Amino acid sequence: MTLFSCLNKENFSEIPVIEYKSLQVKGSDIEVQISFTDGDGDVGFKDGEEQFPYGPCDEYHYNLLVDPYYLLDGKFVKGTVLDYSSKCYPKPLPDTGYFPDTLGYYYRLAYIVPEGKDKSLQGDIYITLNEVMNEFPNDTIRFSIYMYDRSLHKSNVVQTEAVITP
């Protein structure tokens, strides 16, 4: 994942706003580019910032989330896989008693230090989704992307275009 940012004297919302820019297939990987704005400049985590509510088992441990969806019977459904490697086991779903098994690509953006009086941030984020073309063979997939700032404001959700995997 690569992050580029620049400071502008503009009035952006304190709630992050993201915009989908592009998707490129690079071998078995996919690179997605989004742009973002944040009016109060509280994007990203400082080194070691893992206390509540950003701890490893907390809901806000990750601040950039990419969820895959695959085409099933003419509708896009969220990609799932059983993942027993997590140290944080989710609670069972109340209606079924089963555990959620959602697959996602989750990241922790690095802290960006706003400079000057204007703390607003604007920039581009490049996300590399490794081995995606192998994870969903012979499928049509797309991705939903959103982010959180340190004030726990959730951005809008954007979707990529669909990609057909070999």
Task: List the predicted regions and their residue ranges.
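C-terminal motif of bacterial Sec signal peptides marking the signal peptidase cleavage site
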Residues: 2-5
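Non-catalytic macromolecular-recognition regions in eukaryotic signaling proteins
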Residues: 7-166
